[in-house]
Amino acid sequence: MASLDESQVRVILLDIEGTTTPIDFVYKTLFPYASRKLESFVREHARDPEIASLIEELRAQHELDERNRLQPPGWLEDSAEVRLRSSIEYGQWLIARDSKCAPLKSLQGKIWQQGFESGELRGQVFPDVPIAFERWRRKEKIICIYSSGSVLAQQMLFRTTPSGDLTSYISQFFDTRVGVKTESESYEKIAASLSRGPREFLFVSDAVKEIEAAQSAGMQAILCSRDPFADASPGAGRIIHSFDEIFGD
């Protein structure tokens, strides 16, 4: 990895899971909540045009999974009820596999939105996150988020934290609609969308493959490990354990 040149950084691009937000919150709160609510949500909103479109996207994804021999549960179209049941069973299968496919993430985002709005869910971030956001804003850094969760889910998470609504600090949200997080082209698209050169970005994530993809696109990157006793992975470059280490006062 090339040495980090903080003087060039104008945009701080952040991962969520394991970086701004505890992994346990994602896997022990958000995912189980979506799984529990999936059937009732789909049945209640199946006739909504947006949800109907997501169900159709799931059907197309199902065909792709079959072609790739991933052995998803069967999808039948014998009747509206059978189609609905197929979409629910397939959705549960995708959740169990921690799939990052866009229609599932959008559907999860809709379910989580209801949970956040009802107060059943509240966003979680590490304690250093709101402090860092305020510090970076003082230093005139642009803060953006890139997560596999839908943009809607990202916004709801940061809007409902114990520290209050943090979305005013965030200029842009990106999800897998821009591309897979382990592919360099995704980071190139993000840079182009903000009309910035890649070296103006500092990407922070807990995933080595994502770090490598960002670096391949020309971005600067830091591996974030919230475990203070973890060793840096080979080739990961610089590693931090807290946002206090990024543009600290």
Whereabouts are the PLM-identified features?
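Substrate-recognition element of Asp-dependent hydrolases with the DxDx(T/V) motif
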Residues: 109-110, 118-161
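Short catalytic/ligand-binding loop motif for oxyanion handling, primarily in non-cytosolic enzymes
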Residues: 20-24, 152-155, 212, 230-232
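Conserved phosphoryl-transfer catalytic core
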Residues: 26-92
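Asp-based, Mg2+/Mn2+-dependent phosphohydrolase catalytic module
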Residues: 1-8, 168-249
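Short, well-ordered beta-to-alpha junction loops that form the rim of enzyme active sites
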Residues: 16, 146-150, 206
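Metal-dependent phosphoesterase signature
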Residues: 65-127
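Asp-based phosphoryl-transfer active-site loop
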Residues: 5-26
